[in-house]
A protein has these predicted regions:
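Glycine-rich ThDP/TPP pyrophosphate-binding loop and its adjacent helix/strand module
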Residues: 156-348, 356, 539-660, 665
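A glycine-rich phosphate-binding loop feature that marks nucleotide/adenosyl-phosphate handling sites
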Residues: 285-292, 340-343, 364-374, 514-518, ...
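Intrinsically disordered, glycine-rich low-complexity segments
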Residues: 2-11
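Short helix-capping segments at alpha-helix termini
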Residues: 505, 628-633, 685-690
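Thiamine diphosphate
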Residues: 8, 28-190, 212, 366-568, ...
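Peripheral docking tails and interdomain loops at the edges
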Residues: 323, 327, 675-731
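Flexible loop/turn segments at secondary-structure boundaries
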Residues: 116-118, 198-199, 226-229, 262-264, ...
Length: 731
């Protein structure tokens, strides 16, 4: 029975009928093009097909992929590995992709079923099995990730997490990177997934970005009909993803039988040629099978009928492709047997070796959470200020620092919502320009151009995801999330991707993105969605640096450190502090930096230590003055942490040992707030030095209200801070 290959491009429908594995040499294929109401006849160029050597290479990789799946199934049942998920049924389209794309030139965001593709790109059977046993020598993760999470820096196979759908946005950022690194390159980025993952909103954000920017990005969607147990008609409206994408401009769309190597090769050649010619992104929807269950944790017999499973078996490319090779005279059965024997022997030899491989060494668990080449907590980042000019507000210092760093580092780019001066460049002759809702990025687009400072769609996950892909290529994205209250759509990119990348890849990949976020209340009128804190959620993420300055000088030095360090940084900018007169500073110079993890003792004292940060620093200074006026023999020491992860334990310890009393104050909710961890550590490690219980002041355990009186009741005020300080001093 003939297989139908569909090609949608630019709103029209191109269709052709090809037999399974048919490849008439040098023939022309007639396509019928329907656009609007005017049908036209066009001819496509001669069909490009793999060579005999490529077809033999493809079969070898297909067979090896299936036998590796089978070997892992056996090893899992023997309790010699700990998880197994297969790519069975997907092999044909994957080997076709391996023939079309160029390892170490193109870039790859693979998913867990892409075993055959990874083999074609250069990952070996032994490397895959090292991942299966979780060996220290696993080149993808050093035993830190589940099997089938392939990564290889030399081959440009980027480390993937287990999260489905997050890869698309990173691939979009990666595809964008060539414009900065090598505009003449014809590189293409490939991102793959099953059809189920396209239900994630981040797929649609990535598709929108790819079409907006005409990125050289190829989406290979392998539709095996099921997302675990959910059939495609319950997953995708109409049951066909390609048809849903009709309205996306510049997008080439193709649908192909993904169990047919030759047809898949042709479709992918068209898609890749389109992207290499910089016409825009392409999507190939490959209909494949899944003859094995989702994973060894699943039993497909609980939701697939025998008839369904039998029909899938008939389309299994591992059975069909070798028969076609014989029928076409490409290989005889003896030649097939030689490949089978060689592959089986290679897998067995590799298995024997990896079962003797060492596990990750004890004591290595904390390695590679952060960069081992740039340490932002070191003395290297201690710099004396060289003040010039008039005193500036925090927002002005942040803006000037970004100007200086963009001048210094041509790989630094700034983007986010409303950060550009004006997306319509022609308007700049007549308008002042936006430059951020708080003006922190004003003038960056005008000074450095629209390629280096630009507006993004209103999509927080899209901002962080694209920044990840850009940073993975060596660029330095400094992105803005407009309000902390709206950061949550980006949470998967922040937690599952940005914070974990270096650790999960065993230092193979990194993404030193700086995420600038406006945070906090004390504004009057900000209410629930413009005044919240929640920094403790991000200090709980290993691999992420978290910074929160309280004044203009610190904002300058800490932002510069964030930009120059090699780790992802969450840079929290308190909105109330942007234009306060009391925290202004002269500019300290273009090389002024402040180390992370080094607190500032903003007021010395002998009787009580207060640990705080952000907008509460000034309120605590006011409270301390009141308490000292009422208690003339008392002095209070106030510590501004400045960075929340890491934090300066030594300064806290030294102060508490001196004062014997301590209070932690922050704007966020009291319960499970940032101060709880510090309080617990003080109680555990400094108990013998304490003359009073550890005190804490924070917001009420509710949301910030709109009415100013309500907001004042909810957030910590000077009187709350003073009252708790005096309570502790009475012990």
């Amino acid at each position: 029975m003939a297989e139908r290959v569909l090609d949608w491009e630019g709103g029209g429908i191109l269709s052709a009928v090809r037999g399974p594995y048919s490849r008439p040499p040098g023939s022309l294929i007639n396509y019928e093009l329907e656009t609007m109401a005017t049908p036209t006849r066009v001819q496509a160029p001669a069909e490009v097909t793999p060579t005999r050597e490529q077809l033999i290479q493809a079969y070898r990789a297909m067979y090896m992929a299936r036998r590796l799946d089978d070997k892992e199934v056996l090893l899992k049942r023997q309790n010699r590995i700990f998880f197994q998920i297969s790519g069975a049924g997907h092999e044909a389209v994957q080997v076709a992709a391996g023939l079309v794309f160029r390892p170490a030139h193109d870039w790859f965001y693979l998913y867990y079923r892409d075993r055959a593709l990874a083999l074609m790109l250069g990952v070996t059977a032994e490397q895959m099995l090292l991942g299966s046993v979780g060996a220290a020598d696993d080149p993808a993760s050093g035993g830190r990730q589940m099997p089938s999470h392939w990564a290889n820096r030399e081959l440009n196979i980027v480390s993937r997490s287990s999260a489905t759908g997050t890869q698309y946005l990173q691939a979009a950022g990666c595809a964008q990177a060539y414009r900065y690194l090598n505009p003449e390159s014809d590189e293409v980025t490939l991102v793959t997934s099953g059809e189920g993952a396209t239900s994630e909103g981040e797929f649609w954000e990535a598709m929108n970005a790819a079409c907006l920017e005409s990125l050289p990005l190829v989406f290979l969607i392998q539709d095996n009909g099921y997302a675990i147990s959910v059939p495609v008609e319950k997953q995708t409206a109409g049951g066909n993803l390609a048809q849903l994408l009709t309205g996306f401009p510049n997008l080439k769309r193709l649908e192909v039988d993904g169990t047919d190597v030759v047809a898949s090769y042709g479709a992918l050649m068209e898609a890749v040629a389109y992207a290499r010619q910089r016409k825009g992104p392409a999507l190939v929807l490959a209909k494949v099978t899944r003859p094995y269950s989702h994973s060894l944790s699943d039993d497909e017999r609980s939701y697939k009928t025998k008839a369904e499973r039998d029909a899938e078996a008939e389309r299994d490319p591992i059975l069909r492709f070798p028969e076609w090779l014989v029928s076409e005279g490409i290989l005889d059965r003896q030649g097939l047997q030689v490949i089978v024997h060689e592959v089986d022997q290679e897998i067995q030899n590799a298995t024997d070796r990896v079962l003797r491989a060492d596990p990750p060494p004890k004591g290595s668990a904390l390695q590679f959470l952060y960069s081992d080449s740039v340490n932002p907590t070191s003395a290297e980042f201690e710099a004396e200020p060289h003040f010039t000019g008039e005193a500036r507000t925090m927002v002005d210092e942040l803006n000037l620092t970004m100007h200086e760093e963009m001048r210094r580092n041509s790989r630094m780019i700034v983007f986010g919502e409303d950060v550009a001066d004006c997306s319509r460049e022609a308007n700049l002759a007549e308008v002042k320009g936006k430059g951020g809702v708080f003006k922190t990025t004003a003038g960056l687009q005008i000074k450095f151009g629209s390629d280096r400072c630009f507006n993004s769609p209103l999509a927080e996950a899209g901002i962080i995801g694209r920044a990840l892909g850009l940073a993975e290529r060596g660029l330095k994205p400094v992105v803005e999330i407009q309000f902390f209250d709206y950061i949550w759509p980006a949470m998967m990119q922040l937690r599952a991707e940005l914070a974990t990348l270096r650790w999960r890849s065993n230092n193979g990949f990194s993404a030193p993105v700086v995420v600038r976020v406006a945070i906090g209340g004390y504004l009057n009128g900000g209410a629930i969605y413009h005044s919240q804190c929640g920094e403790v959620i991000f200090t709980h993420l290993p691999g992420l640096r978290v910074v929160m300055p309280s004044n203009a000088l610190d904002a300058c030095g800490l932002l510069r450190t964030a930009i120059r360090c090699d780790d992802p940084v969450m840079f929290l900018e308190h909105k109330r502090l942007y234009r306060e007169p009391y925290n202004r500073s002269q500019h300290p110079g273009p090389d002024f930096t402040i180390p992370f993890g080094k607190a500032s003792v903003v007021k010395s004292g002998q009787n009580l230590t207060v640990v705080t940060y952000g907008a509460v620093v000034q309120k605590m200074l006011q409270a301390a003055l009141q308490v000292e006026q009422r208690n003339p023999d008392t002095t209070i020491e106030v510590i501004d942490l400045r960075t929340l992860s890491p934090y300066d334990w030594e300064t806290i310890r030294t102060s508490v040992e001196k004062t014997s009393r301590v209070m932690i104050a922050h704007e966020d909710c009291l319960s499970w707030g940032y101060g709880a961890e510090i309080a617990a550590r003080i109680a555990s490690e400094l108990f013998e030095h304490l003359d009073a219980p550890v005190g804490r002041v924070g917001a009420l355990d509710t949301w910030v209200g709109y009415n100013p009186q309500l907001e004042n009741e909810i957030l910590p005020q000077v009187e709350n801070l003073a009252a708790e300080a005096e309570r502790l001093l009475q012990f």
